[in-house]
Structure formats: C-alpha cells, structure tokens
C-alpha cells in the first residue's frame, strides 16, 4: 500500500507545472525591460573575511532583475549566479532574458569571484526531444551557447529542460545530450556544465548518467506541493512518511557522487484557501475549471514576512517546515520555508557531504538579511585574507604526511591568485591518485577552487594493496606529482 501511495504522490507532482515554468510564464504577462537595458547601479566589490566552504548556487530570474532586487545580493556569500533564462526554441535558437546584457550583475559577480552561469530553458517536451535528438539542431544550440559564453564572458551553462515527453527522453536522450555537450565544450574544460533535475524519478531518469557528463546536478528539491495539490503541504518537506527532501537525496540520488549534488531549496511559499484549520487540509480550488490552479498564489519569502507573519505561525513536525493559518470567513494556509527549516536542509547537505546548496530564487528575500546570515553561519569559515596581495601567488603541491601511511594521509596544495583578471579567481582543480603503472585509483578533488591553501585527508580504498602510489595535481596548464607509500 505504501508503495502505491508513493507512486501516486510522485506521479502527481511529476506532471505538475514547476515553479521555474510557472513563474516564467506568469511574469511574461507583465511589463518587462526592453532588450539592451542596463541598470547603472553597480554593486561594489565586497571585501570580507569570509570564505565559502561549499557551493552556494542561486538562480537570478529576469523578473527579479527587472524589479531591481539584484541590488540586494551579497556576492561574498555566493559562488554561482545563474542567469534565468536564455530560452531555447525548437530550432536551437536562443532568446536572451529581458534587459540583457546584465552588465552590472556580471561585473559585480566577477569582481567578487562569483561565477556567472547561463541557464538554458525549454518547457515543451516536443521541442526538447528535437533539441536533444536532431544532430544539426543540437549542434546549433551548442554553438549558440558557446557564442553567448564567449561574447559575455560567462562561466558555464545550466540546462533546465522540463516536461520531457517520455521515459526514453528522460533515461537516454538527456544523457546523450549532456555527453555530446561535454564533448562539444572540451575546447575549454573550465566552462561548467550542469543539469537541473527533479527531486524524484529514479525509475524514469538516469541521474547517475547525467552526473557523469555534468560538473554537478542542481536537484530541484521543491514543488512537492504546489498549484496542483488537492491538500495543503510544504513545498520542500525535509522529512515525511512517503516523500521528502531527505529521501530524495539518500534514495533517489544514491548512485550519484555526493560531490556532484547541489541541494535546491525554495525561497518561496504557497497560499491556499482550505476547508479546515488542520495541516494537510483539503483545498478550495481558486478556479475549479482550470488545472494547476488550486492555490491562491505563490508567495516570495519577502511577501510572507511582510504580509502574513501577523497570523498564527505553526511548526509541522512531520515535514519540519513552518506554516501559517488564519480565518477570514474561511480558513487560509500558507506553507513556506524560513531560516529554521532551511538550516535543517543545510545540515542535511553538510551531513551528506553534498557539493552545496542552490536557491530558487535570488531576490525573493528582498532586502532582508536573515537568510544571508544563515548562509554565512553554515557555509563560511573565517579567514584573515582580505586583500588580493595576501593570497598565494604560486602553485604548490606538498609532500603528504605521514608518509608511509595507514589508514590515511594528509595532502596539501595551493591555488594562486593571478592579478590578470577574474578568470583566475576560481580555477578547475583535479587531484588524483594513480598506481605505479598509471592506473587511476582515486579522484580526491574534482572541482573549481578559489585561491588559497587546501588540506585534504586521503583514505585509500580498502582493497588497495601495499605499494608506492603517485598523487597528481592539475590546475589549468600546471601539473605536479609526488609519490607516497601505503603500508597495509
């Protein structure tokens, strides 16, 4: 019975319109900035004694940029800003987001060492099938992406393809698409390539295959309840009887390396009219004749705090999320995430050693600071380095210690600062272990790293025999190797 209920719940929100698609289509009905608009208010470079210890990736939607909420971004607490979005049509053409180019955001991000990612979207299953399977159209799309990256000095691409038409497209065509993209962009391995994936769908999606050809996956761990839901409930339940963020990461993504998972979290909530004051109450459809229209509206975090905290706030122990209720000739409920529930999700990312967390969406918190303070609390470590001239200027790979070793050893290396420009602020780093014949044994580091001194604890596989092994560091054109002795 539990399996049947789980399948029903997963199927329900799998066919629902995602927050990415819904907001994009809704905002198009409103006024937007003309092509070529540039907001002249530039963000200043932030000099702080903070260093992120995990990826903090945020989507910045064009409507939040148009409204000026990008001016509240704290760049020193972000590693990536994903411009949302460049829309792909069925022929491989790209439409820029309104107001493009966002020169103020790009300049401010790069001056603070933040990577700027272009998000390429399509929400039409037939169009996506054509983009993924037609060689000519696919290569045209890749070339348009490449030109955009080069022309605007961007640092990578995030593919957000939703509503794929069938299991074959999810399981096979999407993986082949990413494999071809990785091959197409081999000319510049520093470009990050990533894919936005659903929280559930292991039976239909090949998450491990997508991860193999991506630097990371942005797991959209929200929209568990939404406009389509027949009961109230959390957008992102940390825990739950059948479906939850925790279950998604542990079970649905069990075959994906944890360092390739970004845990997406919501900076928004949902508002319903209901038939009772109880959690998970039956909802009164806003429009009973329209699909995906059961709730009243989406509420950005800033709107929840501004307009609804005057009402009774409660905590749902089932999902570990807050909710609000009030009665005005009928019951109303708002379910959302706050700093308390988000901290629990961040703890999950830390405990599971995930690559980091991701935000839908930047700007949704307005000028409030509590969610930024939470990121600082969970994902930064103090550092005395506040000026570029104090950062290392040379690559170094140090001898491991202890050596010989068993069961583990420490490896240290440095990534330098290069005053020639922002491109050197974060560099692609690999640290691998090989046997004496050159066979790869372990991947210790495979990530983008900011300038600094790094210390890694290496524990070899249990089956590794006694012997001499080589650990090799690669950063751009720089390569260094050293030997170590493992005694079993």
Predicted feature residues:
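Positively charged n-region of N-terminal signal peptides that target proteins for export
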Residues: 1-4, 488
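Sec-dependent N-terminal signal peptides
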Residues: 3-13
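Glycan-recognition patch characteristic of GH18 chitinases/ENGases
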Residues: 17-147
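Glycan-binding loop/region signatures in secreted carbohydrate-active enzymes
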Residues: 23-49, 265-347, 379
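Conserved, mostly hydrophobic/aromatic
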Residues: 81, 159, 217, 263, ...
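Substrate-binding surface in catalytic domains of secreted glycosidases
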Residues: 90-100, 143, 163-304
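Short, compositionally biased serine/threonine- and acidic-rich segments at solvent-exposed termini, linkers
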Residues: 381-388
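C-terminal outer-membrane/trafficking sorting elements
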Residues: 389-401, 405-488
């Amino acid at each position: 019975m539990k399996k049947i209920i789980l399948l029903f719940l997963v199927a329900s929100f799998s066919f629902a319109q995602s927050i990415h698609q819904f907001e994009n289509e809704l905002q198009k009905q409103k006024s937007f900035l003309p092509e070529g608009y540039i907001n002249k208010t530039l963000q200043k470079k932030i000099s702080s004694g903070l260093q992120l210890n995990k990826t903090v990736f945020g989507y910045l939607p064009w409507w939040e940029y148009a409204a000026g909420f990008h001016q509240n971004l704290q760049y020193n607490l972000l590693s990536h800003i994903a411009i949302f979005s460049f829309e792909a049509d069925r022929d491989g053409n790209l439409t820029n987001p309104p107001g493009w180019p966002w020169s103020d955001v790009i300049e401010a991000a790069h001056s603070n060492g933040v990577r700027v990612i272009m998000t390429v979207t399509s929400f039409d299953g037939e169009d996506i099938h054509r983009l993924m399977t037609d060689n000519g159209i696919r290569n045209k799309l890749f070339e348009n992406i490449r030109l955009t990256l080069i022309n605007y000095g961007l640092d990578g691409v995030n593919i957000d393809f939703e509503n794929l038409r069938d299991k074959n497209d999810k399981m096979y065509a999407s993986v082949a698409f990413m494999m071809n993209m990785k091959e197409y962009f081999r000319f510049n391995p520093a470009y990050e390539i990533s894919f936005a994936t659903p929280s559930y769908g292991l039976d239909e999606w090949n998450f491990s295959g997508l991860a193999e050809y991506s630097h990371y996956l942005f797991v959209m761990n929200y929209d568990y309840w939404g406009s389509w839901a027949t009961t109230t409930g959390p957008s992102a339940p940390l825990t739950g009887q059948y479906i939850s963020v925790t279950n998604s990461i542990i079970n649905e993504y069990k075959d994906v390396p944890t360092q390739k998972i970004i845990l997406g979290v919501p900076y928004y909530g949902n508002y319903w009219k209901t038939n009772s004051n109880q959690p998970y109450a039956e909802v009164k459809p806003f429009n009973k004749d329209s699909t995906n229209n059961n709730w009243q509206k989406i509420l950005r975090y800033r709107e929840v705090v501004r307009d609804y905290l005057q009402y009774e706030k409660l905590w749902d122990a089932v999902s570990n999320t807050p909710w609000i209720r009030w009665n005005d000739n009928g019951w109303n409920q708002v379910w959302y995430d706050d700093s308390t529930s988000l901290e629990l999700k961040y703890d999950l990312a830390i405990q599971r050693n995930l690559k980091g967390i991701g935000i839908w969406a930047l700007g949704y918190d307005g000028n409030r600071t509590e969610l930024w303070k939470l990121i600082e609390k969970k994902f930064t470590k103090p550092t005395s380095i506040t000026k570029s001239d104090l950062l290392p200027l040379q690559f170094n790979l140090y001898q491991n210690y202890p050596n010989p070793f068993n069961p583990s050893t420490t490896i240290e290396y440095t990534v330098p600062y290069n005053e020639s420009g922002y491109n050197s602020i974060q560099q692609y780093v690999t640290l691998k272990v090989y046997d004496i014949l050159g066979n790869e044994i372990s991947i210790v580091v495979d990530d983008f790293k900011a300038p600094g001194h790094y210390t890694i604890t290496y524990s070899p596989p249990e089956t590794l025999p006694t012997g001499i092994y080589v650990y090799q560091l690669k950063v751009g054109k720089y390569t260094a190797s050293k030997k170590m002795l493992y005694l079993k």
